[in-house]
């Protein structure tokens, strides 16, 4: 019995010693892994190329990152780099994995990134009715990233039905007069006062195939676009800037969301041209990209193939580049399903 007790005591001591050695070994390995991140000073700028990039406060690939960065397409200054990390120039110590950073050409627009949305559904009065969870733009559109050359080729035969006649339509003394068959629609600018909110109306052009004037309204901290029927003077609300398909059956609108940020997209079906009637099929706030929809050098248009061609960018790249039209951008082709 005495021998058994001594044996068990020795066995317990050996196990404890082994566990301590194992823990010490793991600690040495962990310390060694951390020590592998040796940083070298650098001065360069790189883009965040991955939409799901995570931010680290400790440069250790074996630790959990602190949080998601949410700066897809942002151009960041780098002050140091190691084998796995870039140290971002900032008042705080934070690091990004090297595979999440790169050149502008490296920005990753997969089909999932192109189709992802914040919200998708349709408005019913003042209420936004959501689609079921997980629905993306792929339910209504096929969206493909295309080359600059493909965009330019389609542009040569692009469909541009919006025509602006600034000789016939002029604003006089703050009143925009729109001659229609049955009436003259007058839109009067209102200066902002303690009693009145700001209202400014601008003539954007005429969409001849559907006999509609396009008007932009600017208000205090808001704006909209709407049609005025050239025959009846009837007003039709739309989400933002409209693009009519070559067959006249659909309208796609693109513009900034109500909260700013990435692009809002809406699809309308033209139910009737006389009297004019449209139906909202779907409206969505795109998550990761924004269209250069107001750009003269990079216009949005329908091609003869019935697809919408759009110059676009990751949100943070757009904010950096939108005033400089010589900057590169990305291009997508949107096909209605």
Where are these regions (language model features)?
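Bacterial Sec-dependent N-terminal signal peptides
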Residues: 1-28
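Boundary regions of SH3-family modules and the immediately adjacent low-complexity/disordered segments
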Residues: 23-41, 89-136
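Beta-loop motif signature
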Residues: 25-85, 120-123, 180-186, 190
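Terminal domain-start segments
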Residues: 108-217
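Surface-exposed loop/turn elements that mediate protein-protein interactions on large endomembrane-trafficking
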Residues: 174-193, 220-237, 266-285, 323-337
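Blade-terminus and WD-like Trp-Asp/Gly-His loop motifs, strongest in beta-propeller folds
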Residues: 204-209, 241-253, 299-308
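Beta-strand C-termini and the immediately following turn/loop, strongest in propeller blades
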Residues: 215-220, 253-259, 264, 310-316
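Conserved blade-ending motifs and adjacent loop-strand segments that build the rim/top face
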Residues: 280-297
